[in-house]
C-alpha cells in the first residue's frame, strides 16, 4: 500500500505540538509493516537550518494561487525509510515561525494546491492520502471538485484527522476564487459555509472518505455542543465515518532504561534508578532531599485548557500536605506569575520552572511519583503516557484521551494505571490527590502494582499504527 501524509508540521523537522509528534512517528511504524510511506511538509527556514545540507533538490514548477503564479520547489530527504518531500517557497515559509502570520490562510492554501499538484510531478500517486488539521483540510474537497479530471487521482482515498477541533480554519468565502481558483457555488449552497465563513475543517469532514480523531472519547465528545466548537451538528451528521484512534508515543525515545537525560536508568523490573533520579532532581531544584515525600510533576503549557485554574484554586490546600511539586512550562502570563509567587512563598515545597527544557522534562517524568494532568479537554494527550512509561502515576480529569489511556485505580480489584476524577472541579482534584497519597503512604504493595501496570502498558506507535492500517484497508 502507498500511503501519503500531508501536514503543516512533523518531527524532527518542524514541530510545535502533538501533530508534529504524530507525523514524526506514525509513518515510521507503517514502514515497518512493509508499506511505502511518503510525507509532504512545508520547507520552513528551521528545516533549512537543520537539514538543508541533507535535502536533495528534485524539481520545481509553478502553480496558480488564484491570479498569482507561485514558485514550487520540491526537495527530498529519506529518513528512517520514510520519504519526505518538502514544498519550498521562501516567501511563504521562511517566516521564523510555523503559524501565527496574518496571511496563514494564503500560506496554507498555497501549500495544499502545491501538494496536490506535486503528486503527479514526482510520480507518487498514493492509495491513501492522509491529511491533518485545518492546514490541509481543503485537500479532499479540492481533489473532488477541482482536480477530479486528473484520472490518476480518482482512485485516491482520503483520511482526515482532527487533532484539535478548536482550530477550524475559518476564512472569508472570497478565498475560494481568490486563492483556490474554484467557484463560489459550494459556499452558496451551504456545503462549505459555517457561521457565514468558509470553514476548511467542515469541508474535510464532508469530503474525506474517513474522519478520525486522536482518541475514541474525543470522537464522541466533539459530537456534543460542549466540545464540538460549533461543528457538533456536522460531526453528528457524519458520525458514520468518524472514529477515534489513540496516539502512541515513541517508546525508543521515552525509555527510562536508555534515556540519556536521566542520571540513573531504571525499568519496571528494577526501580532503584528512579529513587536516584528523584534525589538528583531534588538537589538540582533546591528542594529538600527526601526519599519518602511524594514528588508531584506537571509538564505542560500553562493554559485554561490544561486545567491550571483548578490547580491554582486548590494549590494552598495541596501544599498543606507533605508533598513536593515540580512545574515545568510556559503559557498564560497570569499563570506564570501565580506559580512563581507560590514557589517563593513555599520554596521547600514547590519548584516553578517557567521555561521549556526537554532534558528537565525527562528528568521530571523519571523522578516524580505522581503526575498531575487535570485538563478541561484533551483530544489525546501524550504527557500522561510518557509519565506512565517512567513510573510517574497520573492524576487526570477523565476526559478525551485521558479517559482512554489512564485506567482509574480500583481499590477492590487492584487494577488501574492511575487516578481520575469525573467532575471538573477543584474539590474533586484535591480529593483524588488525597486518595492517591493514601495509597502511596499506606498501601505500598498496591502502589507498586499500579506502577507495574502503568510502566508495562503498551503505548507504542507499532501498536497504534495497526488501527490506522485497518482503517486504510477498509477503504481499498
Curated annotation (Swiss-Prot):
UniProt feature coiled coil, ranges: none
Swiss-Prot/TrEMBL keywords: Glycogen biosynthesis, Glycosyltransferase, Transferase
Chain residues that bind ADP-alpha-D-glucose: 15
Protein's pathway: Glycan biosynthesis; glycogen biosynthesis
Keyword DNA damage: no
GO molecular function: alpha-1,4-glucan glucosyltransferase (ADP-glucose donor) activity; alpha-1,4-glucan glucosyltransferase (UDP-glucose donor) activity
Entry-linked Gene3D superfamilies: Glycogen Phosphorylase B (3.40.50.2000)
SUPFAM superfamilies, alphabetized: UDP-Glycosyltransferase/glycogen phosphorylase
Signal peptide: none
Enzyme Commission number, as recorded: 2.4.1.21
Catalyzed reaction equations: [(1->4)-alpha-D-glucosyl](n) + ADP-alpha-D-glucose = [(1->4)-alpha-D-glucosyl](n+1) + ADP + H(+)
Domain of life of the source: Bacteria
Biological processes, Gene Ontology terms: glycogen biosynthetic process
CDD domains the record matches: GT5_Glycogen_synthase_DULL1-like
Glycosyltransferase is among the record's keywords: yes
Family the entry assigns: Belongs to the glycosyltransferase 1 family. Bacterial/plant glycogen synthase subfamily.
Annotated function: Synthesizes alpha-1,4-glucan chains using ADP-glucose.
Protein name: Glycogen synthase
Organism from which the protein derives: Streptococcus equi subsp. zooepidemicus (strain H70)
Record gene name: glgA
Amino acid at each position: 500500500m502507498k500511503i501519503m501524509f500531508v501536514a503543516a508540521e512533523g518531527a524532527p523537522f518542524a514541530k510545535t505540538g502533538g501533530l508534529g509528534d504524530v507525523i514524526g512517528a506514525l509513518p515510521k511504524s507503517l514502514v515497518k509493516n512493509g508499506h511505502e510511506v511518503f510525507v509532504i511538509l512545508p520547507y520552513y527556514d528551521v528545516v533549512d537550518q537543520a537539514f538543508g545540507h541533507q535535502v536533495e533538490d528534485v524539481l520545481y514548477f509553478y502553480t496558480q494561487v488564484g491570479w498569482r503564479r507561485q514558485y514550487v520547489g520540491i526537495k527530498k530527504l529519506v529518513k528512517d525509510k520514510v520519504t519526505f518531500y518538502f514544498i519550498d517557497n521562501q516567501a511563504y515559509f521562511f517566516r521564523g515561525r510555523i503559524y501565527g502570520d496574518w496571511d496563514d490562510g494564503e500560506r496554507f492554501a498555497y501549500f495544499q494546491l502545491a501538494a496536490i499538484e506535486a503528486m503527479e510531478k514526482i510520480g507518487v500517486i498514493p492509495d491513501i492520502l492522509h491529511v491533518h488539521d485545518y492546514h490541509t483540510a481543503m485537500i479532499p474537497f479540492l481533489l473532488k471538485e477541482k482536480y477530479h479530471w486528473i484520472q490518476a487521482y480518482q482512485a485516491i482515498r482520503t483520511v482526515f484527522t482532527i487533532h484539535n477541533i478548536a482550530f477550524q480554519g475559518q476564512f472569508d468565502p472570497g478565498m475560494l476564487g481568490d486563492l483556490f481558483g474554484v467557484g463560489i457555488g459550494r459556499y452558496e449552497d451551504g456545503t462549505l459555509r459555517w457561521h457565514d465563513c468558509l470553514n476548511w475543517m467542515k469541508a474535510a469532514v464532508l469530503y474525506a472518505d474517513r474522519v478520525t480523531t486522536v482518541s475514541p472519547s474525543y470522537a464522541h465528545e466533539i459530537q456534543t455542543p460542549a466540545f464540538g466548537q460549533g461543528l457538533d451538528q456536522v460531526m453528528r451528521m457524519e458520525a458514520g465515518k468518524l472514529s477515534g484512534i489513540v496516539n502512541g508515543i515513541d517508546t525508543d525515545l521515552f525509555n527510562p532504561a536508555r534515556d540519556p537525560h536521566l542520571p540513573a536508568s531504571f525499568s519496571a523490573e528494577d526501580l532503584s534508578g528512579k529513587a536516584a533520579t528523584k534525589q538528583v532532581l531534588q538537589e538540582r531544584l533546591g528542594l529538600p532531599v527526601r526519599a519518602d515525600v511524594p514528588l508531584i510533576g506537571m509538564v505542560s503549557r500553562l493554559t485554561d485548557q490544561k486545567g491550571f485554574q483548578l490547580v491554582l484554586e486548590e494549590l494552598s490546600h495541596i501544599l498543606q500536605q507533605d508533598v513536593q511539586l515540580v512545574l515545568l512550562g510556559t503559557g498564560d502570563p497570569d499563570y506564570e506569575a501565580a506559580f512563581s509567587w507560590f514557589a517563593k512563598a513555599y520554596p521547600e515545597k514547590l519548584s516553578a520552572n517557567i521555561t521549556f527544557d526537554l532534558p528537565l522534562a525527562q528528568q521530571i517524568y523519571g523522578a516524580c511519583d505522581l503526575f498531575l494532568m487535570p485538563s478541561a479537554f484533551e483530544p489525546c494527550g501524550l504527557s500522561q503516557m510518557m509519565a506512565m512509561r517512567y513510573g510517574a502515576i497520573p492524576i487526570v480529569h477523565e476526559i478525551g484521551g485521558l479517559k482512554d489511556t489512564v485506567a482509574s485505580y480500583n481499590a477492590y480489584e487492584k487494577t488501574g494505571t492511575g487516578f481520575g476524577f469525573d467532575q471538573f472541579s477543584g474539590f474533586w482534584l484535591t480529593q483524588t490527590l488525597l486518595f492517591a497519597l493514601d495509597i502511596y503512604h499506606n498501601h505500598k504493595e498496591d502502589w507498586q502494582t499500579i506502577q507495574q501496570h502503568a510502566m508495562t502498558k503498551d503505548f507504542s506507535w507499532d501498536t497504534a499504527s495497526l488501527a490506522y492500517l485497518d482503517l486504510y484497508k477498509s477503504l481499498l
